[in-house]
Protein backbone atom coordinates (compact mmCIF):
# COMPACT_ATOMS: atom_id res chain seq x y z
CA UNK A 1 0.00 0.00 0.00
CA UNK A 2 1.35 3.40 -1.02
CA UNK A 3 1.93 5.73 1.95
CA UNK A 4 0.22 9.10 2.07
CA UNK A 5 2.04 12.31 1.29
CA UNK A 6 2.84 14.44 4.34
CA UNK A 7 2.29 18.09 5.26
CA UNK A 8 3.95 19.79 8.24
CA UNK A 9 1.68 22.44 9.78
CA UNK A 10 2.90 25.21 12.08
CA UNK A 11 0.43 24.42 14.85
CA UNK A 12 -0.39 26.43 17.97
CA UNK A 13 -3.32 24.35 19.19
CA UNK A 14 -5.61 27.37 18.92
CA UNK A 15 -8.72 27.94 16.84
CA UNK A 16 -7.15 29.07 13.57
CA UNK A 17 -4.55 26.33 13.24
CA UNK A 18 -7.01 23.67 14.42
CA UNK A 19 -9.38 24.74 11.66
CA UNK A 20 -6.50 24.70 9.18
CA UNK A 21 -5.56 21.21 10.34
CA UNK A 22 -9.07 19.94 9.64
CA UNK A 23 -9.23 21.81 6.33
CA UNK A 24 -5.93 20.29 5.16
CA UNK A 25 -7.21 16.83 6.02
CA UNK A 26 -10.38 17.44 4.01
CA UNK A 27 -8.76 19.01 0.97
CA UNK A 28 -5.44 17.19 0.61
CA UNK A 29 -4.88 13.46 0.46
CA UNK A 30 -2.04 13.73 2.96
CA UNK A 31 -1.06 13.05 6.55
CA UNK A 32 -0.77 16.28 8.55
CA UNK A 33 2.11 16.50 11.03
CA UNK A 34 1.77 19.21 13.68
CA UNK A 35 4.86 21.27 14.52
CA UNK A 36 4.92 23.62 17.52
CA UNK A 37 7.92 25.83 18.30
CA UNK A 38 8.22 26.77 21.96
CA UNK A 39 9.77 30.23 21.77
CA UNK A 40 8.59 31.22 25.23
CA UNK A 41 4.90 31.77 24.58
CA UNK A 42 2.34 30.57 27.10
CA UNK A 43 2.18 26.98 25.95
CA UNK A 44 -0.09 24.19 27.14
CA UNK A 45 1.54 21.03 25.82
CA UNK A 46 -1.27 18.77 26.96
CA UNK A 47 -3.85 20.96 25.23
CA UNK A 48 -1.86 21.05 21.99
CA UNK A 49 -1.49 17.27 21.95
CA UNK A 50 -5.13 16.74 22.92
CA UNK A 51 -6.48 19.08 20.22
CA UNK A 52 -4.25 17.56 17.54
CA UNK A 53 -5.07 13.97 18.49
CA UNK A 54 -8.79 14.81 18.53
CA UNK A 55 -8.41 15.53 14.82
CA UNK A 56 -6.52 12.30 14.17
CA UNK A 57 -2.94 13.54 14.12
CA UNK A 58 -0.34 10.84 14.79
CA UNK A 59 2.87 12.89 14.77
CA UNK A 60 3.07 15.97 16.99
CA UNK A 61 6.37 17.81 17.48
CA UNK A 62 6.83 20.36 20.29
CA UNK A 63 10.36 21.75 20.21
CA UNK A 64 11.91 23.86 22.98
CA UNK A 65 13.68 26.72 21.19
CA UNK A 66 13.73 29.37 23.92
CA UNK A 67 17.51 29.64 24.36
CA UNK A 68 18.14 29.37 20.62
CA UNK A 69 15.54 32.05 19.95
CA UNK A 70 17.08 34.50 22.40
CA UNK A 71 20.76 33.77 21.71
CA UNK A 72 20.70 33.53 17.90
CA UNK A 73 17.82 35.84 17.01
CA UNK A 74 16.97 38.32 19.78
CA UNK A 75 20.53 39.10 20.90
CA UNK A 76 21.85 39.85 17.38
CA UNK A 77 18.87 42.18 16.94
CA UNK A 78 19.64 43.91 20.26
CA UNK A 79 23.23 44.41 19.11
CA UNK A 80 21.82 46.16 16.05
CA UNK A 81 19.40 48.29 18.15
CA UNK A 82 16.66 47.24 15.73
CA UNK A 83 13.55 49.40 16.09
CA UNK A 84 10.94 49.67 13.33
CA UNK A 85 9.29 53.05 12.76
CA UNK A 86 10.75 54.49 15.93
CA UNK A 87 8.99 52.30 18.50
CA UNK A 88 8.44 48.67 17.47
CA UNK A 89 11.07 46.25 18.84
CA UNK A 90 10.15 43.57 16.27
CA UNK A 91 8.98 40.91 18.70
CA UNK A 92 6.73 39.03 16.29
CA UNK A 93 8.99 39.58 13.28
CA UNK A 94 12.05 37.97 14.84
CA UNK A 95 10.33 34.72 15.88
CA UNK A 96 9.13 33.73 12.41
CA UNK A 97 12.52 33.00 10.80
CA UNK A 98 13.42 30.46 13.50
CA UNK A 99 10.02 28.75 13.35
CA UNK A 100 10.25 28.52 9.56
CA UNK A 101 13.76 27.04 9.77
CA UNK A 102 12.77 24.34 12.24
CA UNK A 103 9.51 23.59 10.43
CA UNK A 104 11.45 22.88 7.24
CA UNK A 105 13.83 20.69 9.26
CA UNK A 106 10.79 18.71 10.47
CA UNK A 107 9.50 18.44 6.90
CA UNK A 108 12.81 16.99 5.76
CA UNK A 109 12.93 14.59 8.71
CA UNK A 110 9.48 13.17 7.92
CA UNK A 111 9.85 13.36 4.16
CA UNK A 112 6.97 15.83 3.83
CA UNK A 113 6.26 17.35 0.45
CA UNK A 114 4.67 20.52 1.88
CA UNK A 115 4.50 22.91 4.83
CA UNK A 116 1.59 25.08 5.93
CA UNK A 117 1.05 28.07 8.22
CA UNK A 118 -1.89 29.94 9.72
CA UNK A 119 -0.95 33.50 8.77
CA UNK A 120 -3.77 35.59 7.35
CA UNK A 121 -3.77 37.00 3.84
CA UNK A 122 -3.54 40.57 5.14
CA UNK A 123 -0.59 40.13 7.48
CA UNK A 124 3.19 40.27 7.37
CA UNK A 125 3.74 36.82 8.84
CA UNK A 126 2.83 35.02 5.62
CA UNK A 127 5.81 36.76 4.00
CA UNK A 128 8.15 36.06 6.90
CA UNK A 129 7.27 32.37 7.05
CA UNK A 130 7.45 31.82 3.33
CA UNK A 131 10.77 33.59 2.82
CA UNK A 132 12.17 31.37 5.58
CA UNK A 133 10.66 28.27 3.99
CA UNK A 134 12.18 29.17 0.65
CA UNK A 135 15.64 29.76 2.13
CA UNK A 136 15.84 26.35 3.81
CA UNK A 137 13.55 24.32 1.55
CA UNK A 138 13.15 25.91 -1.88
CA UNK A 139 11.59 22.75 -3.30
CA UNK A 140 9.09 22.24 -0.47
CA UNK A 141 5.52 23.16 -1.44
CA UNK A 142 3.87 25.93 0.61
CA UNK A 143 0.16 25.75 1.45
CA UNK A 144 -1.30 29.04 2.71
CA UNK A 145 -4.98 28.30 3.52
CA UNK A 146 -5.96 31.92 4.15
CA UNK A 147 -5.11 32.68 0.51
CA UNK A 148 -6.95 29.62 -0.81
CA UNK A 149 -10.04 28.75 1.15
CA UNK A 150 -13.47 30.39 1.15
CA UNK A 151 -13.51 31.01 4.91
CA UNK A 152 -13.06 34.74 4.52
CA UNK A 153 -14.19 36.03 7.90
CA UNK A 154 -14.07 35.25 11.59
CA UNK A 155 -17.77 34.35 11.37
CA UNK A 156 -17.02 31.77 8.67
CA UNK A 157 -14.30 30.26 10.86
CA UNK A 158 -16.63 29.95 13.84
CA UNK A 159 -19.27 28.21 11.70
CA UNK A 160 -16.65 25.79 10.34
CA UNK A 161 -15.36 25.08 13.85
CA UNK A 162 -18.85 24.35 15.18
CA UNK A 163 -19.58 22.07 12.23
CA UNK A 164 -16.43 20.04 12.95
CA UNK A 165 -16.63 20.07 16.76
CA UNK A 166 -13.50 22.18 17.12
CA UNK A 167 -13.39 24.00 20.50
CA UNK A 168 -13.95 27.74 20.18
CA UNK A 169 -12.03 29.83 22.74
CA UNK A 170 -13.76 32.83 24.31
CA UNK A 171 -12.79 35.61 26.66
CA UNK A 172 -14.27 36.10 30.14
CA UNK A 173 -17.35 37.71 28.59
CA UNK A 174 -17.93 34.79 26.25
CA UNK A 175 -16.83 36.74 23.17
CA UNK A 176 -14.12 35.68 20.67
CA UNK A 177 -10.70 36.64 22.02
CA UNK A 178 -8.32 39.25 20.65
CA UNK A 179 -5.62 38.17 18.21
CA UNK A 180 -2.61 37.55 20.44
CA UNK A 181 0.94 36.54 19.57
CA UNK A 182 3.53 36.02 22.26
CA UNK A 183 7.03 34.73 22.76
CA UNK A 184 9.78 35.24 25.32
CA UNK A 185 10.59 38.65 23.83
CA UNK A 186 7.13 40.20 23.57
CA UNK A 187 3.34 39.97 23.45
CA UNK A 188 1.22 41.62 20.76
CA UNK A 189 -2.54 42.15 20.90
CA UNK A 190 -4.62 43.13 17.87
CA UNK A 191 -8.21 43.20 16.62
CA UNK A 192 -11.67 44.05 17.97
CA UNK A 193 -11.81 47.50 19.64
CA UNK A 194 -8.18 48.17 18.68
CA UNK A 195 -9.09 48.23 14.99
CA UNK A 196 -10.61 51.69 15.51
CA UNK A 197 -7.67 54.00 16.29
CA UNK A 198 -9.88 56.41 18.25
CA UNK A 199 -10.45 53.72 20.91
CA UNK A 200 -8.08 53.55 23.84
CA UNK A 201 -6.63 50.14 24.61
CA UNK A 202 -8.47 48.64 27.61
CA UNK A 203 -6.23 47.99 30.58
CA UNK A 204 -7.24 44.31 30.75
CA UNK A 205 -5.43 43.68 27.44
CA UNK A 206 -2.00 44.04 29.01
CA UNK A 207 -0.59 40.71 30.13
CA UNK A 208 3.07 41.34 30.91
CA UNK A 209 3.14 44.87 32.24
CA UNK A 210 1.31 46.71 34.98
CA UNK A 211 0.07 50.22 34.35
CA UNK A 212 2.82 52.70 35.31
CA UNK A 213 0.30 54.35 37.65
CA UNK A 214 -0.10 51.06 39.51
CA UNK A 215 3.59 50.17 39.55
CA UNK A 216 5.38 50.13 42.93
CA UNK A 217 6.06 53.47 44.61
CA UNK A 218 9.61 52.29 45.28
CA UNK A 219 12.15 52.05 42.46
CA UNK A 220 13.80 48.79 41.42
CA UNK A 221 17.46 48.57 40.45
CA UNK A 222 19.00 46.05 38.07
CA UNK A 223 22.55 45.60 36.79
CA UNK A 224 23.09 43.92 33.42
CA UNK A 225 26.51 42.55 32.52
CA UNK A 226 27.71 42.29 28.91
CA UNK A 227 30.38 40.24 27.17
CA UNK A 228 31.19 40.61 23.47
CA UNK A 229 28.02 42.65 22.97
CA UNK A 230 25.59 40.20 24.56
CA UNK A 231 24.01 40.28 28.04
CA UNK A 232 25.25 37.43 30.23
CA UNK A 233 24.47 38.42 33.83
CA UNK A 234 21.71 40.06 35.86
CA UNK A 235 22.78 41.49 39.22
CA UNK A 236 26.03 39.57 38.94
CA UNK A 237 24.42 36.18 38.32
CA UNK A 238 25.18 34.40 35.06
CA UNK A 239 22.04 33.12 33.33
CA UNK A 240 21.15 31.24 30.17
CA UNK A 241 19.81 33.51 27.39
CA UNK A 242 16.23 32.40 27.95
CA UNK A 243 16.36 32.72 31.73
CA UNK A 244 18.07 36.10 31.50
CA UNK A 245 15.34 37.55 29.29
CA UNK A 246 12.64 36.01 31.47
CA UNK A 247 14.13 37.62 34.58
CA UNK A 248 14.30 41.01 32.89
CA UNK A 249 10.71 40.61 31.68
CA UNK A 250 9.56 40.10 35.25
CA UNK A 251 11.38 43.05 36.81
CA UNK A 252 10.54 45.44 33.96
CA UNK A 253 6.93 44.31 33.67
CA UNK A 254 6.13 44.89 37.33
CA UNK A 255 7.53 48.43 36.96
CA UNK A 256 5.31 49.28 34.00
CA UNK A 257 8.07 49.25 31.38
CA UNK A 258 7.78 48.17 27.76
CA UNK A 259 4.31 49.18 26.54
CA UNK A 260 3.72 50.46 23.01
CA UNK A 261 0.45 51.34 21.26
CA UNK A 262 1.41 51.41 17.59
CA UNK A 263 -0.09 52.01 14.17
CA UNK A 264 2.45 50.43 11.83
CA UNK A 265 2.96 50.27 8.09
CA UNK A 266 2.80 46.64 7.08
CA UNK A 267 5.08 45.31 4.35
CA UNK A 268 2.09 44.38 2.20
CA UNK A 269 0.90 47.99 2.09
CA UNK A 270 -1.78 48.50 4.76
CA UNK A 271 -1.70 50.08 8.20
CA UNK A 272 -2.53 48.10 11.33
CA UNK A 273 -2.85 48.95 15.00
CA UNK A 274 -1.59 46.82 17.84
CA UNK A 275 -0.61 46.93 21.48
CA UNK A 276 2.85 45.53 22.14
CA UNK A 277 4.58 44.65 25.39
CA UNK A 278 8.35 44.12 25.37
CA UNK A 279 9.50 44.70 28.96
CA UNK A 280 12.83 42.85 29.04
CA UNK A 281 13.70 43.90 25.51
CA UNK A 282 13.15 47.56 26.38
CA UNK A 283 15.60 47.20 29.28
CA UNK A 284 18.16 45.48 27.08
CA UNK A 285 17.97 48.17 24.41
CA UNK A 286 18.62 50.90 26.99
CA UNK A 287 21.41 48.99 28.68
CA UNK A 288 23.12 48.00 25.42
CA UNK A 289 23.18 51.59 24.17
CA UNK A 290 24.59 52.67 27.52
CA UNK A 291 27.44 50.14 27.49
CA UNK A 292 28.28 50.97 23.87
CA UNK A 293 28.49 54.67 24.76
CA UNK A 294 31.67 54.05 26.77
CA UNK A 295 33.16 51.15 24.78
CA UNK A 296 32.79 52.12 21.11
CA UNK A 297 34.25 55.01 19.12
CA UNK A 298 32.04 57.71 17.63
CA UNK A 299 32.37 56.54 14.02
CA UNK A 300 31.27 52.99 14.84
CA UNK A 301 28.30 54.18 16.88
CA UNK A 302 27.18 56.60 14.19
CA UNK A 303 27.52 53.99 11.45
CA UNK A 304 25.31 51.63 13.47
CA UNK A 305 22.72 54.38 13.89
CA UNK A 306 22.88 55.08 10.17
CA UNK A 307 22.19 51.51 9.06
CA UNK A 308 19.69 50.67 11.82
CA UNK A 309 16.48 51.73 9.98
CA UNK A 310 17.34 49.53 6.99
CA UNK A 311 18.44 46.69 9.27
CA UNK A 312 15.14 46.88 11.18
CA UNK A 313 13.12 47.08 7.97
CA UNK A 314 14.77 43.93 6.61
CA UNK A 315 13.81 42.04 9.77
CA UNK A 316 10.27 43.43 9.74
CA UNK A 317 9.80 42.44 6.10
CA UNK A 318 11.01 38.88 6.65
CA UNK A 319 14.51 39.18 5.18
CA UNK A 320 16.37 37.74 8.17
CA UNK A 321 18.12 35.22 5.93
CA UNK A 322 18.92 37.69 3.16
CA UNK A 323 22.41 38.65 2.00
CA UNK A 324 21.59 42.25 2.86
CA UNK A 325 20.80 41.41 6.50
CA UNK A 326 23.88 39.20 6.79
CA UNK A 327 26.07 42.05 5.51
CA UNK A 328 24.54 44.60 7.86
CA UNK A 329 24.96 42.16 10.76
CA UNK A 330 28.69 42.00 10.02
CA UNK A 331 28.86 45.79 10.32
CA UNK A 332 26.81 45.69 13.54
CA UNK A 333 29.13 43.05 15.02
CA UNK A 334 32.42 44.47 13.76
CA UNK A 335 33.53 45.67 17.19
CA UNK A 336 31.24 43.69 19.47
CA UNK A 337 34.31 42.20 21.18
CA UNK A 338 34.88 45.63 22.75
CA UNK A 339 31.38 45.80 24.22
CA UNK A 340 32.09 44.43 27.70
CA UNK A 341 31.10 45.68 31.13
CA UNK A 342 27.97 46.40 33.13
CA UNK A 343 25.16 48.93 33.31
CA UNK A 344 23.05 49.73 36.36
CA UNK A 345 19.48 50.85 35.67
CA UNK A 346 16.76 52.36 37.83
CA UNK A 347 13.19 51.32 37.02
CA UNK A 348 10.33 53.45 38.28
CA UNK A 349 6.73 53.71 37.06
CA UNK A 350 7.42 53.10 33.38
CA UNK A 351 10.72 54.98 33.28
CA UNK A 352 14.28 53.75 32.88
CA UNK A 353 17.21 55.77 34.21
CA UNK A 354 20.83 54.81 33.57
CA UNK A 355 22.58 55.04 36.94
CA UNK A 356 26.11 53.91 36.06
CA UNK A 357 28.33 52.25 33.44
CA UNK A 358 31.48 50.22 34.09
CA UNK A 359 33.95 48.69 31.65
CA UNK A 360 37.59 47.76 31.14
CA UNK A 361 37.33 48.28 27.35
CA UNK A 362 37.10 52.02 27.80
CA UNK A 363 36.69 54.49 24.94
CA UNK A 364 35.87 57.16 27.54
CA UNK A 365 38.69 59.24 29.03
CA UNK A 366 38.05 60.96 32.34
CA UNK A 367 41.29 62.94 31.94
CA UNK A 368 40.34 64.36 28.55
CA UNK A 369 36.83 65.36 29.54
CA UNK A 370 37.72 66.74 32.97
CA UNK A 371 37.02 70.42 33.77
CA UNK A 372 40.24 70.41 35.77
CA UNK A 373 43.52 71.38 34.11
CA UNK A 374 45.22 68.54 32.24
CA UNK A 375 47.82 68.08 29.52
CA UNK A 376 46.18 65.23 27.64
CA UNK A 377 44.03 67.51 25.48
CA UNK A 378 45.60 70.35 23.46
CA UNK A 379 43.06 73.17 23.41
CA UNK A 380 45.06 75.17 20.88
CA UNK A 381 44.20 72.59 18.23
CA UNK A 382 40.52 73.41 18.58
CA UNK A 383 40.84 76.77 16.82
CA UNK A 384 42.39 75.11 13.76
CA UNK A 385 39.64 72.49 13.87
CA UNK A 386 36.92 75.18 13.87
CA UNK A 387 38.60 77.16 11.07
CA UNK A 388 38.74 74.04 8.92
CA UNK A 389 35.01 73.52 9.33
CA UNK A 390 34.30 77.19 8.59
CA UNK A 391 35.82 76.62 5.15
CA UNK A 392 33.40 73.77 4.54
CA UNK A 393 30.49 76.18 5.01
CA UNK A 394 31.78 78.33 2.12
CA UNK A 395 32.52 75.51 -0.31
From Swiss-Prot:
EC number(s) recorded for this UniProt protein: 6.3.4.5
CDD domains membership: ASS (cd01999)
Which cellular component, as a GO term, is one annotated location? cytoplasm
Q: Which residues bind L-aspartate?
A: 120, 124-125
Q: Membrane-spanning residues where? A: none
Q: Which reaction does it catalyse?
A: L-citrulline + L-aspartate + ATP = 2-(N(omega)-L-arginino)succinate + AMP + diphosphate + H(+)
Localization annotation: Cytoplasm
Q: Which GO terms describe its biological process?
A: argininosuccinate metabolic process; L-arginine biosynthetic process; urea cycle
The metabolic or biological pathway listed in the UniProt record of this protein is: Amino-acid biosynthesis; L-arginine biosynthesis; L-arginine from L-ornithine and carbamoyl phosphate: step 2/3
Q: How does it assemble?
A: Homotetramer.
What PANTHER family does the entry give? Answer: ARGININOSUCCINATE SYNTHASE
Q: What name appears for this protein in its UniProt entry? A: Argininosuccinate synthase
Name the gene that codes for it: argG
Amino acid sequence: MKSKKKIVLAYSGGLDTSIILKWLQENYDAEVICYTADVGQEIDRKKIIKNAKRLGVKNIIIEDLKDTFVKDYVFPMIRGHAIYEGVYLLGTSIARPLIAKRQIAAAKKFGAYAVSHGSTGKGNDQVRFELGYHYFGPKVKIIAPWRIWKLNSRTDLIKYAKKNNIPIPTDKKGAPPFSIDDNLYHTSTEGKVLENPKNSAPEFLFQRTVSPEKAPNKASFVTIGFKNGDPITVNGKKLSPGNLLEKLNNVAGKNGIGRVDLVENRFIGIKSRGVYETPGGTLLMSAHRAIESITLDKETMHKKDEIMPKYAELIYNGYWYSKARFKLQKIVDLKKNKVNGSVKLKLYKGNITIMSRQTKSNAYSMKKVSFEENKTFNKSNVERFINFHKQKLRS
